[in-house]
Structures are given as C-alpha cells and as structure tokens.
Amino acid sequence: MDHKNPLVSWNVFGFDLVFNLASIMMLVITAIIVFLIAIICTRNLKKRPSGKQNFIEWIFDFVRSIIESNMAWKKGGQFHFLAVTLILFIFVANMLGLPFAIVTKDHYLWWKSPTADATVTLTLSTMMILLTHYYGVKMRGTKAYIGNYFKPFWPLAIINVFEEFSSTLTLGLRLYGNIFAGELLLSLLAGLVVSSAWGWIIGIPGLIVWQGFSIFVGSIQAYIFIMLSMVYMSHKVADTH
C-alpha cells in the first residue's frame, strides 16, 4: 500500500517551500532522545564508571578512535563532541522506524526513521561538508585553502570542485538508501503477515530476521557517516591535500 507524506507548503517571495511534517516531527523526537541520553548518562559522574557512564564513555572512546585514525588528536580533538553528537543522532534516527510505523486512515505516514527521507540525509551531508570547508579555511587560511584546489596543476581544480559535490551526494544518499530500503522491506513483510491466513508463516520469521539485520545496518551506517565525515574533515584541515 502506498503511503503519503504529510506535506505543507509556504510561499516565500514567490517560491513554494515544501516541508514534510513527519520528518520534522521525527527529527525533533530524535533530538529529544539524544538530549535525554546525554543527560541521563552524564549525571552523577564518578571516577570509577559503571552502567550508563560506562556506555557514554565507550561512545566517546569509540569516536575518538575514529578521529585519531584520520588525523592527529591535536587537530581532531576539537571535533570530538561534534562527532559524538552526530553518531548518536544518526543511530537513534536510524532505529526509530524499525519497531513500528504510524499511518493514518488517509494513508499518511507519520512515524518513520527521519533518515529514510533523502532531504534529511542530504541536509546532514551538506552541513557536514560545509563545516569541513569552514574549518579548512579557519585552520589553514583562505589563500592556502583555495590554492590547494589548484595543486599540482590548475586543471585539477575542476575535478576537485566536482569531487565536493559528489562527496555530498554519496554521503547523504548512502545513508538514505540503506535506511529507506530496510523500512520498505519491513513494511512489505508486515503486509505479508496480515494479507492472508498463512502469511505469518513466512512473514513473522522474516520480520524477526530483518529487524535484527536492520539494527546492524543502521549501526553500520551511523559509523560510516561519521568515519567519512572525519575523513573529509582531515583532508580539509591537513597541511597537505
């Protein structure tokens, strides 16, 4: 069954801006969950961590290892909180659409993973790529940063600029494609369960297996997004490109 997105459009200076209300709602929910995780896991910190403090410290150590695998900690340390926030945000966003979906009588899909929306993932990737440019200019200087696009000879500038656009697209669309495909198959399996009396024989085992696989894929995609983001960042802030 085809689902529709709850869209609203605003006319601004003659241009129609279309917003997906479901994606906005799910992004807010994701942000709230990440905020609560941060608050709960960092309350009453102790020198000897246990339980939830162990979890958040493991996340920080894991992300630090990603950063250190791409650049010196002296430069990469300032991106630590950014990367931790991103990996938690993307992981939670990837997981939200797995347990269930909420669809109204009019077939409007309200509850889903926000990362199953290409607009969301491309916005995340665009923001990340723009941040790499910002820190590249800030840490290396405008002249050195722009001049690097023309090395070792100026015709490469065209290829380097094209690479920036392709990096943005691949970073965002990779995340979107994997999460969207996972939720699509889950909806098909759920439809198989309710479509016939015998559908549950295949549908329920398939749902269980695919749910587990989707958790794995969602986790891997969060890791890949952060890893590639730090790779791109290291290329921009390093003294050599």
Swiss-Prot record:
It is a multi-pass membrane protein. Keywords: ATP synthesis, Cell membrane, CF(0), Hydrogen ion transport, Ion transport, Membrane, Transmembrane, Transmembrane helix, Transport. SUPFAM superfamilies: F1F0 ATP synthase subunit A (SSF81336). One of its GO terms (molecular function) is proton-transporting ATP synthase activity, rotational mechanism. Belongs to the ATPase A chain family. Gene3D superfamilies: ATP synthase, F0 complex, subunit A. It comes from the Bacteria. One of its GO terms (cellular component) is plasma membrane. GO terms for biological process: proton motive force-driven plasma membrane ATP synthesis. This is ATP synthase subunit a. InterPro entries: ATP_syn_F0_a_bact/chloroplast, ATP_synth_F0_asu, ATP_synth_F0_asu_AS, F0_ATP_A_sf. The lineage of its organism: Bacteria, Bacillati, Bacillota, Bacilli, Bacillales. Its main location: membrane. NCBIfam families: ATP_synt_6_or_A, PRK05815.1-4. The chain crosses the membrane at residues 21-41, 83-103, 117-137, 175-195, 218-238. The gene is atpB. It is found in: Cell membrane. Key component of the proton channel; it plays a direct role in the translocation of protons across the membrane. F-type ATPases have 2 components, CF(1) - the catalytic core - and CF(0) - the membrane proton channel. CF(1) has five subunits: alpha(3), beta(3), gamma(1), delta(1), epsilon(1). CF(0) has three main subunits: a(1), b(2) and c(9-12). The alpha and beta chains form an alternating ring which encloses part of the gamma chain. CF(1) is attached to CF(0) by a central stalk formed by the gamma and epsilon chains, while a peripheral stalk is formed by the delta and b chains. HAMAP family: ATP_synth_a_bact (MF_01393). It comes from Staphylococcus haemolyticus (strain JCSC1435).
